């Protein structure tokens, strides 16, 4: 019965065309998902593609693990070392790419430090430059305190009721810390294009069913 239905679908020209369009669209979507990942080499040259994704993954795997105080301090120390050797220069695109090439392996951890030690919903790109050793160990604690402070402000009075605020705080308290870091660029890129792929599949499926 199933074989008969499959033959019935492929016997129609519109069905075959729809499947070809779907296959072509999936290939294009996969191509964009792969080329969406950028790797910067030691010369400051940007690369995309499978090799670039693989190289970036290798860089990030060096920092994979539990983000405890020692790991966070190691990121801060490495970033400050990079800043000394490859400082950011306004308007100097090449110099800035060299800087980025040295930071790309732990850039997401750096951003987490910047956000975790700022006020809630705030981001200071240069916060990591002034982080003290005492502050590093209080990053997770500060994330909870900054959320509590924000939820108790006038800004959130019309956004959340008491139950919703309590729920948000509870979820933050339940979060297992220290966090564990690993590369997720592949998943991030795949999820970015997942909606497009699902829409294409449903569109072609609708043609097949209607036929």
Placement of each model-derived feature along the sequence:
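Juxtamembrane non-transmembrane segments of integral membrane proteins
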Residues: 26-103
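Lipid-exposed faces of alpha-helical membrane segments in multi-pass integral membrane proteins
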Residues: 20-28, 198-204
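Aromatic- and glycine-rich beta-strand/loop motifs that create alpha-glucan
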Residues: 1-22
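Extracytoplasmic loops/domains of multi-pass membrane proteins
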Residues: 79-141
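Membrane-interface helix-boundary signature
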Residues: 11-15, 36, 188-191
């Amino acid at each position: 019965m199933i074989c008969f239905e499959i033959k019935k679908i492929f016997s129609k020209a519109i069905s075959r065309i729809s499947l070809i369009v779907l296959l072509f669209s999936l290939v294009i979507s996969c191509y964009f998902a792969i080329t969406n990942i950028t790797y910067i080499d030691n010369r400051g040259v940007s690369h995309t593609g499978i090799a670039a994704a693989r190289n970036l993954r290798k860089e990030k795997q060096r920092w994979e693990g539990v983000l405890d105080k020692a790991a966070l301090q190691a990121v801060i120390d490495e970033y400050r070392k990079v800043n000394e050797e490859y400082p950011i220069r306004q308007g100097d695109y090449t110099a800035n790419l060299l800087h980025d090439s040295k930071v790309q392996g732990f850039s997401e951890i750096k951003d987490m430090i910047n956000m975790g030690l700022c006020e809630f919903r705030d981001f200071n790109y240069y916060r990591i430059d002034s982080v003290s050793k005492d502050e590093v160990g209080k990053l997770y604690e500060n994330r909870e305190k900054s959320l509590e402070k924000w939820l108790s402000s006038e800004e959130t009075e019309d956004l959340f009721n008491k139950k919703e605020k309590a729920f948000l705080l509870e979820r933050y308290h339940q979060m297992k810390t220290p966090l564990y870091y690993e590369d997720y660029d592949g998943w991030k890129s795949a999820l970015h294009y997942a909606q497009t792929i699902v829409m294409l599949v449903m569109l072609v499926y609708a043609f097949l069913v209607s036929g």
